Amino acid sequence: MYELSVTGDKSVLKKRTRVRMNGIRKMIGPEGRARADAAIAAKVVEHPAYLDADEVFTYLSVGEEVDTREIIRDAWSRGKTVAVPRCVEGTNLMEWYRIDDFEGLEQGAYGIEEPAADPARLMEVPGPGTDVKAVAIVPGYSFDDKGYRLGYGGGYYDVFLPTFGGASVGLGRRQQWSEEPLNFDEHDVPVDYVVIG
């Protein structure tokens, strides 16, 4: 267990944990990732928070992240609206755009595929207390038993999650599970559920 007294210590610990978790993710290998990701997708599409949602706000997976494409395809097959993020340059904000297929995506910030900034497809994020049934699918390097996550350091989901009125579901492989608490900072916001495969 770590005892931290200053913000700098927390920052160093977070960076070290990110490096370690990134290495763990890479060591799983393509076949192991594919098996785990299929199991995760199968659990997500049967999860009550997902089944109840009319709108699915999800990341587009890249690299060794848990693959979200099967979840997205399932959402489309059920008539759900799917929105994916576009990073707002120079900020830690995301705008969410409706997609109906994987065509027309462009290379965005951090090498991540993003939707085009089409005002006609810009989605309003349902805030706390709204009647919209929505779920957010959230990436991370690691998750703990309280739903706290270790993200990538940009703060995008730390800004997004408090403004989101639906349920949030973090995705991770079993190797990404943390026995140690991951709520390093006051602004860290846990997800409602974590699906591990």
Put a short name on every predicted segment.
Residues 1-12, 23-27, 107, 116-119, ...:
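Surface-exposed, charge/polar-rich loops and edge strands
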Residues 62-64, 141-145:
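Short glycine-rich anion-binding loops that position phosphate/pyrophosphate groups of nucleotides
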Residues 17, 40, 156-157, 190:
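Internal, well-ordered alpha-helical segments in soluble enzyme and binding-protein domains
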Residues 59, 139, 197:
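Conserved residues at the C-terminal ends of beta-strands
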Residues 56, 136-137:
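Receiver (REC) domain switch-region micro-motif
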Residues 2-131:
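N-terminal active-site beta-alpha-beta segment that forms phosphate/nucleotide-binding
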Residues 43, 149-150:
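Short linear sequence motifs
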